[in-house]
Curated annotation (Swiss-Prot):
GO cellular component: extracellular region
UniProt keyword Aminoacyl-tRNA synthetase, yes or no: no
Location of this chain's protein in the cell: Secreted
Species of origin: Acanthocheilonema viteae
Annotated protein name in UniProt: Fatty-acid and retinol-binding protein 1
Chain's gene name: far-1
Disulfide-bonded cysteines: none
Gene3D superfamilies in the record: 1.20.120.1100
Post-translational modification remark: N-glycosylated.
Amino acid sequence: MYHQLILMALIGVIMANVVPFSMSNIPEEYKEFIPEEVKNFYKNLTQEDRQILRELASKHATFTNEDAALEALKNKSDKLYQKAVELRNFVKAKIDSLKPDAKAFVDEIIAKVRSLRPEDGQKLDVEKLKQAARDIIAKYEALNEETKEELKAPFPNTTKIITNEKFTRIANSFLQKN
């Protein structure tokens, strides 16, 4: 579950498709939107950790679920596995603290974004990504105000993203239909 976070998942999980393995690969203008816990996770990765993550990311289609991927990670590096589980549990606790409507919204986003992962050897389909982002934004906008407010407390960075003018301009330009 640690592949989320634009609209609860979009940036993070999409980044999981092109895992940067280093905060230095993320443009400066986007770094302010990344939660400290995620920054710390990446900041504390060793070269060996990054190599392990790259190797496992290249095999993502072979894992039946997240637990299988974590088990493979554990077999490669118990220390890295512990870090990943800690981050996963942090995010999972935030999601689990939500009321049913907000939790359903987040779970739906996670499922949608995970479905965008390309098959082995394939590239991420940018048009599908754009459509998924448009769908997620439309679903967010359709939420009642109470649910939107509830999402703010456990996910302050997501709120910051959604309400940031600079990000909105970047997102609108990216999401334009070709």
